[in-house]
Every structure is written in C-alpha cells, then in structure tokens.
Amino acid sequence: MQDTFQRQINYLRIAITDRCNLRCRYCMPATGVPLKGHEDILRLEEIATLARVAAGTGISRIRLTGGEPLVRKNVVTLVRELAAIPGLEEISLTTNGIFLGALAFSLKEAGLKRVNISLDTLKKDRYRYITRRGNITSVWQGIRAALAAGLTPVKLNVVITRGFNDDEILDFARLAREEPLHIRFIELMPIGTAAASGTAYVPAEEIKGRISRVYPLEPFPDLATNGPAANFRLVGGRGSVGFITPMSNHFCSRCNRLRLTADGKLRPCLYWDGEIDIKGPLRAGAPETELAAIFARAVSLKPAEHHMENGWRQPRAMSQIGG
C-alpha cells in the first residue's frame, strides 16, 4: 500500500494485549492503567484474520507487541498461524524478556524470526526500581535463550533518561562490543507518564558522542531491517549500537507502518490521536474486501509527520497503544 506521501506501507505492529507484568516508570503509573475487558480485546482468531487481510493489501512484516505480548495465552499458537499466512515474510516480537526464557525455542519453532527486548539498565537494583517489580536475572535468561534459539539479531531497546541511566551508556556499548547483541538507544518520547519528563530527555547525538569518544564506530548497513535506527558497529566488536531519534531527527518521511491496538483500532501514526475501528466491522461480519478497505483508509490518513516537538502530548500509555 502507498500513502498520500508516496510512502510504501508494509509493516503492521499488532498489540495482542494491553496487559503487562511490569510497571515501568516512564510507561505507566504504579497502579497500572485501566484495562480493557476480555470481550473488548481482539481474539486470537480475529488477529489472524486481520493479519491475513493485511497481507492481502501489501503488509509483509508483522511485529507483535503489548502490553507484554508473552502474557497472552496461546501466543505460540498465534505465531504459528501468522507464520503460515502467504505474503507475510517476517513475524517478530518486542518483549520485556521476563517470560522469554521459557518460550524462546517454542516461538522459534512456530515461525518467529527475531525479538527485541526492552532493557533500560544493567543494574539489578535499578532494574527493580524502574520496573517496580521485575527481576533482571529472568531477562538475561530470556536473552540467552533467544540467542540459543536463533531469534536473531537480538536487539535490546534502551530508553536513556538523564539523571537515571545515562551513566550506563558506555556499559551498554561495552556489552555490544563483547556480545552478539544489538543495542538500540531510543530517545525518550512524551507518551504516557513520560510526557512530564522533559528534563530527562537525552538526544541521540549526545549518546553517540559519548560512545564514539571511547569506542570507534563505523556504519553498519548490514543490520538494516527497514527500520528507523541508524546502526553502527563498534570496531572489533561482536554486536552493534543503533540510535532511534523520534525527537531530534524524526524519520517520518520513511515511515512504513501501521498499528493495530489490542482493542481493534488501527492507528496510522503512533503520535496521532486518530484511530479507526476495525473490530466492529469484523465482528459484524464484514467481508474481507471491506476490511481491506478499512486498512486502505487508515493508510490514506497517515500524517506527513508527528508534532511532538511542538508540544503535542500523547495521553495514552504506550501499553495501551502498542509500543
């Protein structure tokens, strides 16, 4: 599909649940966020149907998100069904890694290609603080299992916040040098509870500068996966570092994605309030041609770019939208 700005839209991010086993401070309050009722959430067979329709419109890549997607029952079955859909070239998943150790090999066997794991600190106590309940040992078990299962390249998503974990930038770079891991530093965005954290923002150029003064960097185009990161190899290292810059140097001109929320809404842009209901027509028995037209309408509504730098704020938590 092509939008009104001649961008090819071939990537669908599907939030398969709004539930999460953690309460990360920049994502949601300690009490969590209001959850949708069971009937409000797309059923697995509905997700598979919409994925099949999306593939028919030109979607070739799907990423499963949440919430935390691995808390969804029968997620392995869902992956297997999605992997069997003609036209879908890649199924990937973003997770906090807590349950990945137990599921990595089953997910790989079902057809999952690779994983991104959210990890904002390498320190046990700090991890517990930021997640309010997590155990970093479980995350490392998940990382090792993902590598062993071949869910590669394994990428670690790191949101850097000033005064909290910016002292670990070089620690993460060292990890990428010593291990076959790909660290993606992501600029803090004004979404959910992070909307009130303006002073915590650290631009990617500052992060890159700190790293390059210690570890020489060279462009790493081999890791290109049609995503927004600018990737670099640490000379002599086993992994890489990448920088995702939604604030300082947005990548809207090459955006190729749609989002499907857990409650069945299509979002043309993460940073836009507009949503299009597709669950309602699906449950009302709409034919697949009508559902395909709804996908096409969502694509036609994609804005040219976001407006976060102009003070726009997303009131919904990332777990509600689908990160």
From Swiss-Prot:
Q: Can you tell me which residues bind GTP? A: 13, 63, 94, 155, 257-259
- Reaction equation(s) it catalyzes: GTP + AH2 + S-adenosyl-L-methionine = (8S)-3',8-cyclo-7,8-dihydroguanosine 5'-triphosphate + 5'-deoxyadenosine + L-methionine + A + H(+)
A Pfam family in this protein?
A: Radical_SAM
Q: Does the keyword Signal apply?
A: no
Pathway info: Cofactor biosynthesis; molybdopterin biosynthesis
The protein depicted here goes by the name GTP 3',8-cyclase
Q: Which residues cross the membrane?
A: none
The prosthetic group or cofactor this protein requires is: [4Fe-4S] cluster
Q: Which UniProt keywords apply?
A: 4Fe-4S, GTP-binding, Iron, Iron-sulfur, Lyase, Metal-binding, Molybdenum cofactor biosynthesis, Nucleotide-binding, S-adenosyl-L-methionine
Q: What class of enzyme is it?
A: lyase
Function recorded in the entry: Catalyzes the cyclization of GTP to (8S)-3',8-cyclo-7,8-dihydroguanosine 5'-triphosphate.
Q: Keyword Iron: yes or no?
A: yes
The Radical SAM core domain covers 4-226
Recorded superkingdom = Bacteria
Question: What CDD domains does the record point to?
Answer: Radical_SAM, Twitch_MoaA
**EC number assigned by the record:** 4.1.99.22
PROSITE patterns xrefs: MOAA_NIFB_PQQE, RADICAL_SAM
Set out the biological process GO terms recorded for this chain's protein.
Mo-molybdopterin cofactor biosynthetic process
What residues does S-adenosyl-L-methionine bind to?
A: 26, 67, 118, 189
State whether it acts alone or in a complex, and with which partners, per the record. Answer: Monomer and homodimer.
| One example GO MF annotation | cyclic pyranopterin monophosphate synthase activity
Q: Which Gene3D superfamilies match?
A: Aldolase class I (3.20.20.70)
Residues binding [4Fe-4S] cluster 1 are 20, 24, 27
Instruction: State the similarity comment.
Output: Belongs to the radical SAM superfamily. MoaA family.
Q: Which gene encodes it?
A: moaA
